[in-house]
Amino acid sequence: MALTICTRFTDEYQLFEELGKGAFSVVRRCVKISSGQEYAAKIINTKKLSARDHQKLEREARICRLLKHPNIVRLHDSISEEGFHYLVFDLVTGGELFEDIVAREYYSEADASHCIQQILESVHHCHVNGIVHRDLKPENLLLASKMKGAAVKLADFGLAIEVQGDQQAWFGFAGTPGYLSPEVLRKDPYGKPVDMWACGVILYILLVGYPPFWDEDQHRLYQQIKAGAYDFPSPEWDTVTPEAKDLINKMLTINPSKRITAAEAPKHPWICQRSTVASMMHRQETVECLKKFNARRKLKGAILTTLLVTRNFSAAKSLLNKKPDGVKVNNKTNLASSPKDTGPAPALEPQTTVIHNPVDRNKESTESANTTIEDEDLKARRFGNLSINSIWQPSVGRPQNSEPKQAPNSSVQTCQVINKARKQEIIKVTEQLIESINNGDFEAYAKICDPGLTSFEPEALGNLVEGHDFHRFYFENALSKGNKPVHTILLNPHVHLIGEDAACIAYIRLTQYMDGSGMPRTMQSEETRVWHRRDGKWLNIHFHRSGAPSVPIN
């Protein structure tokens, strides 16, 4: 699609309230003056984009303009002006499908069948037009309106690629970890079947409220997916019909050539004979699990969006977490003992999109998903919110070029060295904070902690504490610079980097001191601290401590 150049957007459209905001863009409601029709206009600040980014915008616009289906968010116009690019989409007001489900009074297998049918129809339309979405997940499944029975709309073609027929090729390691197919993880040629695998994951979640593949460790998560290691555990799956499980099995078939297609799946009895095959029983347990699943996704998204929008877009730092070809950042701090208890809790959350080097087929990534290996010519590039269909929530990044290029080893080594140095920096600032506590130096402590510091700690009896006043009391009444010597050891500190300007550290804290009778004592506590770098300075914004009080009270 040729972009319309030098057309005055404001001559044709009137802008209204803001709907959302990203790093380099803002989304506002607009009305076409000639027709009075409402749309959503994504306004991208092109002054911050490179020539290559402009090409990618044009490619994505071309893909979106090609797709005209009632279950796909449609791009109506693409207008380029000096310094800005305007993308005019359907105004989709119903929010996410998964959020709507948990608000319903009644939800059954038959409802899940109707949902997946619409998703499959949108995917089939993509495939017929030679488009592979590559990033099917709950965040990209929206509802046209808040009316009952509103159509499901597939959104965000930021990772979409164009293919010829049933072409299988290596288009790069791209997608969202929990929804990646085995062939992508094996670095094999792939094509349209990757979307059907993701549909299988989505259908699984629609039926029980948690994902089929989950693990707090990236490598183990990927091993599960490559092995197709999922099951239908009791008791929640006991009430799911065999036909529903059969469709999931056909979608989650490891061999892509034997996987059910987007044309075949709607003909499955569980979908085309829904009224007689799919169960009508209300699935309350699914709704409850889905609430936890949604809550975890939203919390992670809110934290990452804040970090991304406020980060320093320095070209010198861009090697750490460049995202022009990557997408949403991931952190590895959320753990869970069971997907049924708290929803998905792997190190790689299902909503976290990641892209790796498209040609390094033999190397299993040893970094967390927020590390993107890119081409030499991108080394000084900054990342931005370029996904032109991500209207309803800020996101960053774009798809990898389908033409594979080798990422130089020096880039990988440099990234590893910088990450290692930053982890040591987090350990050091944590030690400084602990030292200020041991010394009873509240002034030094306050300089290292954010004024809005939040915490869970034994002294607060399970309550969330905010600010410094709670801790000031202990500094002034239980601690002093003249106290007997206290020595603290941090055992096994583990640092997880969250973008360039945030990190989380977990460790065991051993505190040695002399009690009132002169006897040596040792206390142990387990701590997790979240750090955020602001104006070049690390500040502790949250901590969680269990075990004994942090400092002995004489």
Swiss-Prot record:
It comes from the Eukaryota. One of its GO terms (cellular component) is postsynaptic density. Autophosphorylation of CAMK2 plays an important role in the regulation of the kinase activity. Residues 324-375, 392-413 are annotated as: Disordered. Its EC number is 2.7.11.17. Coiled coil: none annotated. It holds the Pfam family CaMKII_AD. GO terms for molecular function: ATP binding; calcium/calmodulin-dependent protein kinase activity; calmodulin binding; protein serine kinase activity. Residues 330-340 have a biased composition (Polar residues). The keyword Phosphoprotein applies. This is Calcium/calmodulin-dependent protein kinase type II delta 2 chain. It comes from Danio rerio (Zebrafish). The gene is camk2d2.
